Swiss-Prot record:
InterPro entries: TF_IIS-typ, TFIIS/CRSP70_N_sub, TFIIS/LEDGF_dom_sf, TFIIS_cen_dom, TFIIS_cen_dom_sf, TFIIS_N, TFSII, Znf_TFIIS. Disulfide bonds: none annotated. It comes from Caenorhabditis elegans. Residues 102-125 have a biased composition (Basic and acidic residues). A zinc finger (TFIIS-type) spans 266-306. One of its GO terms (biological process) is transcription elongation by RNA polymerase II. This is Putative transcription elongation factor S-II.
Length: 308
């Protein structure tokens, strides 16, 4: 019996467990034993949908050890799809071809072999296969019965996966769960403040002008627990922080100028009371090649205004 035929046969047994509830620890372990011995390939995974079926069985079983074992097997298959399994270190070529390739290279020593760095497969490269593993370990069981928390974790995961993945990326699924759990712990419920905090983090992770934040979270520079408690100011990009600092300084300066005694003048007419009993002060609030800002204070009604 070929590996494909054996996998198809085992798929039927997995379907029986999922559809009829005929699971037992012994039966599940036996199935997993047989599946782990099959030399799985992308073709088999694609034709049999074995990843989806075993993942469904994982969610059905009540034994944690069996569920964990199924999860590990699914991860091994995911590695096959991603081209990271030990049998495919050369990019997916079979061992025999690899041997022939090495022989050819040995016969041509003048050509220096340059090993290309690992490139993460694009999400759309094999959508029909990758979809089988999208929920292999996500979401965790403790979120499956809470619709709000589950949706929050899914949205956070989507935001973490928004765009290219940097080198050294941690597991986005685990990060999404850790962020959600910390948010829930801080707000102690799925209330309005919890929802607002989730939305704020999703917005900042998806902000194309703040790519450094998402990269820092994915690579662990900013820990998931820390990210969950960061303020809007802390999450903001450098450009936004500079703008906020500028506006704050201008507001402070304007307030200070308004309470300081300026130069008396009747050149300015108050737009509020119509009188010309005013004082003014001029300061360079912008770059040196820009006009100075004039701060005017009406001594009659207390109205303040400025112009350049």
């Amino acid at each position: 019996m070929s590996a494909l035929e054996e996998t198809q046969s085992l798929c039927k047994q997995v379907d029986d467990i999922c559809n009829n509830g005929m699971e037992s620890v012994e039966q599940c372990n036996k199935l997993l034993d047989q599946l782990s011995k099959i030399p799985m390939s992308i073709e088999i995974i694609q034709k049999t949908n074995i990843g989806i079926k075993v993942n469904m069985m994982r969610k059905k079983v009540t034994d944690d050890a069996v569920a964990k074992r199924a999860k590990n097997i699914i991860k091994d298959w995911k590695n096959v799809v991603d081209g990271k399994s030990k049998s495919q270190d050369d990019g997916g070529a079979p061992p025999a071809k690899k041997h022939r390739k090495e022989s050819v290279e040995e016969a041509k020593p003048e050509k220096k072999k340059i090993e290309a760095p690992y490139k993460r497969p694009e999400p759309s490269s094999r959508p029909e296969i990758v979809a089988q593993f999208a929920s292999a370990s996500f979401p965790p069981k403790h979120l499956e019965n809470d619709e709000t928390r589950l949706k929050s974790a899914q949205l956070l995961l989507s935001a973490l996966r928004f765009g290219d993945m940097p080198q050294g990326t941690l597991d986005p699924e685990e990060l999404a769960v850790q962020i959600e759990e910390k948010l829930y712990s801080v707000h102690r419920d799925t209330n309005k403040s919890y929802s607002a905090a989730v939305r704020s983090r999703i917005f900042n992770l998806r902000d194309k002008k703040n790519l450094a934040l998402r990269e820092n979270v994915l690579t662990g520079v900013v820990r998931a627990e820390k990210f969950a408690t960061m303020t809007s100011e802390e999450m903001a990009s450098a450009e936004i922080r500079e703008m906020r600092d500028k506006f704050t300084k201008e507001a402070i300066l304007e307030h200070q100028m308004s309470v300081q005694q300026g130069t008396p003048s009747d050149m300015f007419k108050c737009g509020k009371c119509g009188k010309k009993n005013c004082t003014y002060t001029q300061l360079q609030t912008r770059s040196s090649d820009e006009p100075m800002t004039t701060f005017v204070f009406c001594l009659e009604c207390g109205n303040r205004w400025k112009f350049c």
